A protein has these predicted regions:
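Charged, long alpha-helical assembly modules
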Residues: 94-112
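Inward-facing hydrophobic residues that define packing positions of alpha-helical scaffold repeats
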Residues: 64-65, 103
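Structural marker of alpha-solenoid helical repeat scaffolds
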Residues: 36, 70-74, 109
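Short coil/turn linking the two alpha-helices of tandem helical-hairpin repeats
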Residues: 55, 72-75, 94
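Catalytic-site signature of metal-activated, phosphate-bearing donor transferases
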Residues: 1-62
Length: 112
């Protein structure tokens, strides 16, 4: 079930895990991949997203903040996605003001 919905005329963004696919192997494989290749910013991003999908809010926030600090994490759309995932994790932890701040950062990162 989707969480809170924000509307802006002409804009819609939905990103939810595909419930038709088994995700049982994603997390252990991503954790292994990041241990083996800690400088692979793409897999760090995916690991943080997977923590979000699993409701592991603190792991999500920590991992995605690390992703944003990586010198190779330059793709602005992916950086903005990490910020949105951090925002959603903050929201789910009851930190609405922090969530708002992260959403605003995401908009600034990739305003298109």
């Amino acid at each position: 079930m989707p969480g809170p919905i924000v509307t802006a005329e002409g804009v819609q963004l939905d990103h939810h895990p595909d419930q038709a696919k088994s995700r049982s192997q994603y997390l252990p494989l991503l954790e292994l991949s990041v241990r083996e290749e800690p400088n692979d910013d793409r897999n760090v991003h995916y690991l943080g997203r997977e923590y979000l999908y699993r409701g592991r809010w603190d792991d999500c926030i920590r991992t995605l903040k690390h992703h944003l600090s990586m010198p190779t994490a330059l793709w602005r759309d992916e950086r903005a996605a990490s910020m949105r995932y951090i925002a959603k994790a903050c929201w789910n932890k009851g930190s609405g003001a922090q969530a708002r701040d992260w959403y605003l950062r995401a908009i600034t990162e990739a305003p298109h």
